[in-house]
Regions:
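Asp-based, Mg2+/Mn2+-dependent phosphohydrolase catalytic module
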Residues: 2-221
């Protein structure tokens, strides 16, 4: 196999009896791509050559971006796009939003009521839904409130939080009645096609409850 990922993936491949190679000229049967912040362009070229020659193509996830403390940087999805520009097919995904890695992780850990935390709707939340896992969307990465409002049904999280601290907080409870929704005292009403948000205060908890109530009115399909 030709591996376009970190050395850790090489080690894991060897443990499974696979033989990592470094170039398409070594006729790999498969290409495995995983996120590597230090990937060399030549490695992506070799991956493209191998896939063109008929090697099977696998990837861990399609995340286009990755959040850092300085902003977003290209993720594995961007590296996949480099190879994809040279071939006429898509890689087989092992990780989110596909089910295999999520299900394998739950089985290995013996999970009974897992919750998947993520900041991307198109991979994290979609992956959790595909695997039947409860999801918590956190506002610390690629997607935000506007993305939530436009989310398709299969990309809508079960819970919303500011960050991982939400795991230690009680879940938000929303009560919907007619054209209004209320969450922990925060009220959102639909008036003549417009949404009016009435917050009792403006701390993070209140704002999140306001967002949760708003989404109950927006997510009507």
């Amino acid at each position: 196999v030709l591996i376009a990922a970190t050395s850790n993936v090489d080690d894991l491949a060897r443990k499974r009896g696979l033989v990592p190679v470094h170039g398409a000229d070594e006729h790999p049967q498969a290409v495995i791509q995983g996120y590597d912040p230090d990937i060399e362009w030549s490695r992506l070229e070799e991956a493209a050559f191998a896939v063109q020659a008929g090697a099977r193509w696998y990837a861990s996830n399609p995340d286009m971006t990755r959040p850092t403390d300085r902003g977003l940087v290209p993720g594995l999805g961007a590296q996949l796009a480099v190879v994809g520009a040279c071939v006429d097919r898509e890689p087989t995904m092992a990780g989110k939003p596909a089910r295999p890695l999520l299900e394998a992780t739950c089985t290995r850990l013996g999970c009974h009521r897992p919750i998947f935390v993520g900041d991307r709707l198109d991979t994290d939340i979609l992956g959790a839904r595909n695997a039947g896992i409860t999801s918590l969307f956190v506002l610390t990465g690629a997607h935000g409130v506007h993305d939530l409002m436009d989310a398709d049904p299969d990309r809508r999280p079960d819970h919303i939080g500011a960050d991982l601290g939400a795991l230690l907080e009680p879940p938000q409870r929303v009560v919907v009645g007619g054209d209004a929704a209320r969450c922990d005292g925060q009220l959102v009403r639909q008036i003549d096609g417009d949404l009016e948000v009435d917050l009792t205060n403006h701390d993070m908890a209140a704002q999140l409850c306001g967002v949760r109530a708003l989404l109950e009115l927006v997510w009507t399909d």
